[in-house]
């Protein structure tokens, strides 16, 4: 089983991760990230918005099994994170989350 928190940290430190709902949506419209992670407690409107743009871009979505507060803590950030986009995983194996989901 993949440790989501550790792999997310490795992706942030060695790759490129876009944090935030608005920025994630922009990246789906312009750059097509490799993976989108959304918090389990994201509001329905936000989830539907991200799912729509991810489907258009052909990007897989992984639902983080915790709240936006826990996703922020996993990313070592002092705030809530509703969604993030992995543009470059770096040395992490975070893209394997999609295979296990």
UniProtKB/Swiss-Prot annotation:
The keyword Transport does not apply. It comes from the Archaea. It comes from Pyrobaculum calidifontis (strain DSM 21063 / JCM 11548 / VA1). GO terms for cellular component: cytosolic large ribosomal subunit. This is Large ribosomal subunit protein eL30. The gene is rpl30e. NCBIfam families: PRK01018.1 (NF002172). The lineage of its organism: Archaea, Thermoproteota, Thermoprotei, Thermoproteales, Thermoproteaceae. GO terms for biological process: translation. Belongs to the eukaryotic ribosomal protein eL30 family. Gene3D superfamilies: 3.30.1330.30. Pfam families: Ribosomal_L7Ae (PF01248). Keywords: Ribonucleoprotein, Ribosomal protein.
